[in-house]
């Protein structure tokens, strides 16, 4: 009985999110349309409750296992979960007005968001291939439905179909890679796979082939080249509220997935997967930055920007050392904050019947609202890596880790591409400050959205000038989880 209680205690945050998701679905059945704000309130309360439980049950420097070693509770999982709660909560604040104006303010929107969050939490704490895959599939199925949520938009339906087909293909590759590793090592437990590899597995060629399939599946989930074909279409076709969710919170789960699989499970094969990640990183930075320059749609531009950011993230992983993993975690945190701000401004400018998703929609924003133009300026500078913003320090950290690992040529390439990539971010600034507005409609938004958006952008500036605290949190999460 004590073992069961211990298992349930370890998974208490997941249980809270699961119960709240089911409660939201039931509540929606009994509420009239004008009372649906209660669904939003209960969703936020569920996130707050899960955050409090995660913080209160956190044990410093203690790694505990549950469900026969299939579930782990360590500093890395706790830090990432807290970041997920925060990001999801902010995302719901940013999107509340947007979804209410588009007949998407329904129980299933909030329930799917919570179920997707549950899948990500399982991925973060998964210590077994089946647990990791179960969390991934729960997340993926929810995202397919969310992309198609706006049923009157044919672009959204098309994007959901593409996402589903390509997602199923990537899941198959992941499963195939896992089955190959199981065939060689005889186990699906991440720690036991690592031990089997340390003792020396006989079929190295089969192992490498399995790693190739795993990297391909992971590359799709991250949106790295050459598995990025879904990113622009899904970002463009999905409702902006859903694009924000896909572009921010889910990347934290993908980061955790890579940590659990590659670092904790397959570190012995680092020399094999390092080269694969290096190729993906270089291609992602190159194609992401070059293609983004040609875009006129803001969502597609940010989609290709995401691809290039994934390339920089992979620099941290291919460094194959503690500094690299810490810098990669720091980078993903910075990326999530930048993405929240960028899409937050887009949602702020949107209104009923109008999607502010073209670059031209930002023309003359400084004349309409100097404050929001200033916030977007900070966000764009951070994405471009201009000091003293958080984006600059994040790029500096991953490139420094890669330099210490001996990838001098790749670091020089990344710096050159960062300078080239700055063009399309500065183009946004030029449109806001030097062009005449095409639309003088007053910008209306809830006060909580305005306050959070302001804090979001200013945080990018503050953390850029004083990044050490966030870096210390990332270092603590990484170093105290790998014992």
Swiss-Prot record:
EC number assigned by the record: 7.1.1.-
Biological process terms in GO annotation: ATP synthesis coupled electron transport
Database matches in Pfam families: Proton_antipo_M (PF00361)
Cell compartments where the protein resides: Cell inner membrane
Keywords: Cell inner membrane, Cell membrane, Membrane, NAD, Quinone, Translocase, Transmembrane, Transmembrane helix, Transport, Ubiquinone
Membrane topology value: Multi-pass membrane protein
Enzyme class, broadest EC rank: translocase
Single GO molecular function: NADH dehydrogenase (ubiquinone) activity
Transmembrane segments: 11-31, 37-57, 82-100, 110-130, 164-184, 205-225, 239-259, 268-288, 301-321, 329-349, 372-392, 406-426, 446-466
GO-annotated cellular components: plasma membrane
Catalytic activity annotation: a quinone + NADH + 5 H(+)(in) = a quinol + NAD(+) + 4 H(+)(out)
The protein's assembly and partners: NDH-1 is composed of 14 different subunits. Subunits NuoA, H, J, K, L, M, N constitute the membrane sector of the complex.
Role played: NDH-1 shuttles electrons from NADH, via FMN and iron-sulfur (Fe-S) centers, to quinones in the respiratory chain. The immediate electron acceptor for the enzyme in this species is believed to be ubiquinone. Couples the redox reaction to proton translocation (for every two electrons transferred, four hydrogen ions are translocated across the cytoplasmic membrane), and thus conserves the redox energy in a proton gradient.
Similarity-based family: Belongs to the complex I subunit 2 family.
Listed name of the protein: NADH-quinone oxidoreductase subunit N
Native source organism of the sequence: Methylovorus glucosotrophus (strain SIP3-4)
Classification lineage: Bacteria, Pseudomonadati, Pseudomonadota, Betaproteobacteria, Nitrosomonadales
Record gene name: nuoN
């Amino acid at each position: 009985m004590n073992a069961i209680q211990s298992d349930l205690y370890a998974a208490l945050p997941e249980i809270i999110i699961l119960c709240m998701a089911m409660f939201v679905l039931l509540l929606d059945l009994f509420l009239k349309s004008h009372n649906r704000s209660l669904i939003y309130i209960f969703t936020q309360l569920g996130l707050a409750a899960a955050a409090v439980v995660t913080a209160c049950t956190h044990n410093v420097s203690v790694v505990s296992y549950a469900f026969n070693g299939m579930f782990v509770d360590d500093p890395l999982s706790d830090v990432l979960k807290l970041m997920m709660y925060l990001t999801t909560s902010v995302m719901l604040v940013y999107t509340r007005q947007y979804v209410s104006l588009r007949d998407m303010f329904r129980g299933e929107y909030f329930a799917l968001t919570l179920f997707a969050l549950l899948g990500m939490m399982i991925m973060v704490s998964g210590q077994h291939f089946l647990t990791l895959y179960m969390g991934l599939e729960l997340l993926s199925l929810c995202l397919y439905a969310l992309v198609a949520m706006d049923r009157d938009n044919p672009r959204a339906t098309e994007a959901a179909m593409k996402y589903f087909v390509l997602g199923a293909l990537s899941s198959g590759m992941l499963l195939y890679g896992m089955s190959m590793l199981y065939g060689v090592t005889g186990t699906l437990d991440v720690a036991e796979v690592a031990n089997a590899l340390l003792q020396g597995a006989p079929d190295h060629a089969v192992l490498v082939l399995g790693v190739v399939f795993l990297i391909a599946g992971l590359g799709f989930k991250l949106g790295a080249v050459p598995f990025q074909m879904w990113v622009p279409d899904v970002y463009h076709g999905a409702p902006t509220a859903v694009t924000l969710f896909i572009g921010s919170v889910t990347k934290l789960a993908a980061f955790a997935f890579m940590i659990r699989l590659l670092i904790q499970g397959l570190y012995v094969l680092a020399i094999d997967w390092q080269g694969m990640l290096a190729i993906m990183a270089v291609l992602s930075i190159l194609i992401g930055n070059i293609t983004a320059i040609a875009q006129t749609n803001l969502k597609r531009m940010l989609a290709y920007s995401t691809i290039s950011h994934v390339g920089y993230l992979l620099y941290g992983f291919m460094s194959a050392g503690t500094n690299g993993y810490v810098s990669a975690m720091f980078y993903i945190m910075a990326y999530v904050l930048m993405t929240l701000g960028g899409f937050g401004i887009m949602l702020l400018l949107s209104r009923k019947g109008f999607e502010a998703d073209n670059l031209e929609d930002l023309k003359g924003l400084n004349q309409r609202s100097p404050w929001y133009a200033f916030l977007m300026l900070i966000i764009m500078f951070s994405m471009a890596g201009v000091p003293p913003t958080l984006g600059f320090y994040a790029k500096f950290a991953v490139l420094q880790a890669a330099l210490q690992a001996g990838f001098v040529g790749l670091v020089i390439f990344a710096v050159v591409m960062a300078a080239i990539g700055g063009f399309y971010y500065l183009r946004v600034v030029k449109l806001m400050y030097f062009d005449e507005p095409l639309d003088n409609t007053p910008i209306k938004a809830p006060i909580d959205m305005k306050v959070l958006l302001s804090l979001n952008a200013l945080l990018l500036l503050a953390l850029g000038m004083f990044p050490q605290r966030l870096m210390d949190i990332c270092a603590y999460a990484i170093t105290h989880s790998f014992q």
